[in-house]
Swiss-Prot record:
It comes from the Eukaryota. It catalyses: alpha-D-glucose 6-phosphate = beta-D-fructose 6-phosphate. This is Glucose-6-phosphate isomerase, cytosolic. The keyword Nucleus does not apply. Gene3D superfamilies: 1.10.1390.10, Glucose-6-phosphate isomerase like protein, domain 1.
């Protein structure tokens, strides 16, 4: 008998659908009273502790989710990814970001070729180059050391490296290595972003890393040309070769741009942009800032979770459990969003990165075979570090819509502070909130409790908390380069699990193409209107009105301008 075309046609899916009513008749107050249940929903791996007991789920729910995983052939799909099969079927590509952090002696193949030696050739090249820049043997055009780096990229070429950079900034080892150096990221084509990035920097001491696989990404290349002009106008055109390097595979365009092809660092078609932080995309700028040894620990942490994900049984497998619970929350309980809430300011850029990893991967409306999905998939991801978020959007999380939450805590702070006479230290104050918030969401506060506290009758409806709001708690022992790599890989694989269950392609992103193609038409119109004075034609009434208004208000923009660089 042929397998069902959609996961929703399987008995395991239908069984979970029927099970929803059983769960809706329970409350987390009741579920949390079952100690045996709670113990069964706690998993530890390498001192990372996952507690998912505050999910709206019983042990029966979890067993049914395991059956759903079997029906979706989850283990086989994971194996196919690691084996280099072309699981990105719409682009006919392998998906092998796990190879980017594999040990040197590993064998991971794509199209019959072990790609790990190629990965390490690039890593060795990055190590050599970054060490030469950091020790002053590679200098700028005027002989000065290159202390400042601007990485130019967008999307996955920016969000992942920025997350890791921000997380490492306050790590004692990393911050010591970065002393006297600065790393910035230029992503947005908005000239304000360029202005902010070059503000306070000297072209003589600045190295620019241009990240574009094809060297044709419109926003990235315009920003790269802007920084090339910034360098050339100060130091002369010949300085570009000493002040700009590339992460790209298009060596002819790299050379045409003015960058020595020997200073181009490769990555491959089997690396998706949002999964590329462990490639030269992230490793090069991060190594320039923190040294290769620190970044290598980050890669080792990610590899540690890669091994765990591929080998651990589902009931002990952290990414699998998180992925299955997300499917349960989205497709069965009907919760469309997820809040990522790290109780560590160092993780302030985690949510924006995972927002892209998750929403670009799983924001699909059809199956991998092109069939419309008759169920909800994908999550709306957002988040802020605690306790900042508590004073922002937690109001809605507590008394508005039900939004499942990921609480991420760190046992030992990167930067401990102790003040004489305080009841608790700063980190304990932070963690007090980390431990309290999940219970507040789970238990809530009843009208009966409020009455016992003599709350005024007219305020009781306003002060009632319904509770029964699901969350998971992830406790990391520390937050160093190794643990940051682990955390990244947990979320990457969690997203893959969701896509494997839903039966979608989590590794393409056709949704970004339509807007880009329409922008090309607008770009041509703006050029024709500015240079030739042509009126706006070929657009709907709304767009024509807006474009015309924009052109009229910027009529002072010269048709053939001389170069003007941003100034702050």
């Amino acid at each position: 008998m042929a397998s069902p075309a959609l996961i929703s046609e399987t008995e395991a899916w239908k069984d979970l659908k029927a099970h929803v009513e059983d769960i809706k008749r329970t409350h987390l107050r009741e579920l949390m009273g079952d100690t045996e249940r709670c113990q069964s929903m706690m998993v530890e791996f390498d001192n990372i502790f996952l507690d998912y007991s505050r999910q709206q789920a019983s042990p029966d729910t979890i067993n049914k989710l395991y059956k759903l995983a079997d029906a979706a052939h989850l283990k086989q799909k994971i194996d196919r990814m690691y084996n280099g099969d072309h699981i990105n079927s719409t682009e006919n590509r392998s998906v092998l970001h796990v190879a980017l952090r594999a040990p040197r002696n590993s064998a991971i193949c794509s199209d019959g070729k072990n790609v790990v030696p190629d990965v390490w050739n690039v890593l060795d090249k990055i190590k050599d180059f970054s060490e030469r820049v950091r020790n002053g043997s590679w200098v700028g055009a005027t002989g000065k050391e290159l202390k400042d780096v601007i990485a130019v990229g967008i999307g996955g070429s920016f969000l992942g490296p920025l997350f890791v950079h921000t997380a490492l900034q306050t790590d004692p080892e990393a911050s010591k290595n970065a002393r006297g150096r600065e790393l910035r990221f230029l992503a947005n084509v908005d000239p304000i972003d360029a202005a902010r990035n070059i503000s306070g920097l000297d072209p003589e001491t600045t190295l620019v890393v241009v990240v574009s696989k094809t060297f044709t990404t419109a926003e990235t290349m315009l920003n790269a040309r802007t920084l090339r002009e910034w360098i050339s106008s100060a130091l002369g055109p010949s300085a570009v070769a000493k002040h700009m390097v590339a992460v790209s595979t298009n060596l002819p365009l790299v050379e045409k741009f003015g960058i020595d092809p020997n200073n181009a660092f490769a990555f491959w078609d089997w690396v998706g942009g949002r999964y590329s932080v462990c490639s030269a995309v992230g490793v090069l700028p991060l190594s320039l800032q923190y040294g290769f040894a620190v970044v290598e620990k980050f890669l080792q942490g990610a590899h540690n979770i890669d091994q765990h994900f591929s080998s651990a049984p589902f009931e002990k497998n952290i990414p699998v459990l998180l992925g299955l619970l997300s499917v349960w929350n989205v497709s069965f309980l009907g919760y469309p969003a997820r809040a990522i809430l790290p109780y560590s300011q160092a993780l302030e850029k985690l949510a924006p990165h995972i927002q892209q990893v998750s929403m670009e991967s799983n924001g699909k409306g059809v199956s991998i075979d092109g069939l419309p999905l008759p169920f909800e998939s994908g999550e709306i991801d957002f988040g802020e570090p605690g306790t900042n978020g508590q004073h922002s959007f937690y109001q809605l999380i507590h008394q508005g819509r039900v939004i499942p939450c990921d609480f991420i805590g760190v046992v030992k702070s990167q930067q401990p502070v102790y003040l004489k006479g305080e009841v608790v230290n700063n980190h304990d104050e932070l963690m007090s909130n980390f431990f309290a918030q999940p219970d507040a969401l789970a238990y809530g506060k009843t009208p009966e409790q409020l009455k016992k506290e003599n709350v005024s009758e007219h305020l009781i409806p306003h002060k009632t908390f319904t509770g029964n709001r699901p969350s998971v708690s992830i406790l990391l022992p520390t937050l160093d380069a190794y643990r940051i790599g682990q955390l990244l890989a947990i979320y990457e694989h969690r997203v893959a699990v969701q896509g494997f269950i839903w039966g979608i392609n989590s590794f393409d992103q056709w949704g970004v193409e339509l807007g880009k193609s329409l922008a090309t038409q607008v770009r041509k119109q703006l050029h024709a209107s500015r240079v030739k004075g042509e009126s706006v034609e070929g657009f709907n009434f709304s767009t024509k009105t807006l474009l015309t208004r924009y052109l009229e208000a910027t009529s002072d923009v010269p048709a053939a301008p001389s170069t003007l660089l941003p100034k702050i």
